[in-house]
C-alpha cells in the first residue's frame, strides 16, 4: 500500500515541477518580449565583454611573442657585437594619432569653408542629465537670434562644410527631448555646421517603427533644403565629446561607438545603432532604411547589410571620441520584433524592394522654435513589399 502511494506521489511531484518550470520559462519569455531594452542591454554587455576579453588575450599574446623575439635578438646581438642595442623589429603597430585642432587665435573668413577641427571643439562635454521641460530649453535658446524657426542654424563667420539634417525618431519620450537639445544644439554650433532638427513622431497603435520614421523624416527634410548630410539620432543618446564631428564623409559613419550602458564597449563589430550618418547620395543608393521592422531590433543590422551590399564600409571615431551617455528610461521599451531574423537573412533580396521606393505616408507638420515636428500614423499597408 505504501509503495502504491509512493508511485502516486511521484507523478504528482513531477507534474508540479513541470508546471513550475513552464511558468518560469513563460514568464522569462514574456519579459524578453515586452522589455527587450533591459534584456538586450545585458546581452550586449556580455557580448562586449567577450570581445574585450578576446582582444586582450590577442594583445597579451602579441606582447609575449614580441618580448620573446626581442630577447632572442638581443642575445644574438650582444654575443656578436658585445653590445645591447635596442632592437627595431620590422613589424606594424597601430597607434592612436592625436588630432591637431586649430589654435584659439584662428581667424575665420566668411567666404572660406569652415574647418573640421575648430578651436571651439574642446573635447569632453559637461553632461547634465537632470530632467527639464521644453519651456526651459525655449527660454535658454531664445536669447540666440541666429536660431531660426524649426531649429535651423548656420554659421556667419565661415561657409558650412556640411548642411546637416538631424532626424530624431520619437514616441512618448518627452522627458528626453529637452535633455538632448540642451547638449546637442550648442555642440553643433561649435562645429560650425549648418543644421536643422526633424522630430519624426509616430502615433497610432502599431509597434514602433524606427526605420520607417527615418525614411519619412528624410523625405520631409529634403523638401526644405538641399541637405547633403543626414544624421539618424536616437533621442536618448547624448554625445560626450564635441570633437565627434557630425559631418559626413566618403563612407557611412557610426558615431555612437561607446555607450555607457554597454560599459563603453562596442557590442559587436556590425553594431550600427544609436547615432549614424550618411550622405544623401549614400542614403539614396542603399534605398534608405527598411520599412518592415515593427518593434524593437533588427533595423540597424539591416542598414549595416545595405551599406555593405552597396560597396561601402563604415567609419568610426577614434578612441573615446565616440562615447555617449544614455538618458535613463522611465517606461517600458518597445516589444521585440520576433520576425527580424527571417528578414535579415533576406537583406540583399529585399534591399531593392523595401525602403524609400515603396514608402507611403500622410504627415501632419507643425513647427516648434527648435525643430520641425512630423507626425505620422504608420501601418504595414503603407509600405507593402512585392514577393522576392
UniProtKB/Swiss-Prot annotation:
Cellular component terms per the entry's GO annotation: Golgi apparatus; Golgi cisterna membrane; Golgi membrane
Major localization class: Golgi
Reaction catalysis annotation: a beta-D-glucosyl-(1<->1')-N-acylsphing-4-enine + UDP-alpha-D-galactose = a beta-D-Gal-(1->4)-beta-D-Glc-(1<->1)-Cer(d18:1(4E)) + UDP + H(+)
Positions of Mn(2+) binding: 236, 329
CDD domains: b4GalT
Residues annotated as binding UDP-alpha-D-galactose: 169-173, 208-210, 235-236, 264, 296, 329-330
Membrane topology, from the record: Single-pass type II membrane protein
Expression across tissues: Ubiquitously expressed.
EC class name: transferase
Localization per record: Golgi apparatus, Golgi stack membrane; Golgi apparatus
Pathway recorded for this protein: Protein modification; protein glycosylation; Sphingolipid metabolism
Membrane topology (Lumenal): 36-388
One biological process term in Gene Ontology: carbohydrate metabolic process
EC number assigned by the record: 2.4.1.-, 2.4.1.274
Family matches, as PANTHER family: BETA-1,4-GALACTOSYLTRANSFERASE, BETA-1,4-GALACTOSYLTRANSFERASE 5
Protein name as annotated: Beta-1,4-galactosyltransferase 5
Source organism of the structure: Homo sapiens
Gene giving rise to this polypeptide: B4GALT5
